[in-house]
Amino acid sequence: MLLLKKIIRLIFLICTLQLKKNIGKLGVLLSLETPKNNSEVLNFGKQLAMQIAASSPLSIDKDTLDKNILKKEMEIIEEEVKNSGKNKEISQRITESKLNKFINENTLLNQEWIMEPKKKVKDIIKNVAGKDKIKIKKIVRYKVGEAI
């Protein structure tokens, strides 16, 4: 007998609320897919939304990162390294290192968890999920006045 787990889709919306004039200028939409619907997952979703608001990831992971963004960043890095006067082998290692740093800083799963910087977001997700799986389906971060 095949037992299908009910997949619960949780969507979090968090707006930064500050007193005075900055009320609601930043928002995050986060869609999670998980078989759990408990307070731990709900609290984690809120924390993850705050992570997104604070760190402005460009995508969830490397696979979903826009190839044009990667290409432009690679061109910038190559030009920078070329001007440094290093030999080809060292230049290649520097380029790879800088590109990996860019990817880690701009993809949500590879970012350092703001509340525990020694861990990455993907490690925190594994800890919260336990045996079950939490999947990030979609993230949207918006700021008043920015194009979406």
What are these regions (language model features)?
Residues 1-148:
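N-terminal assembly/interaction segments in proteins that build large macromolecular machines
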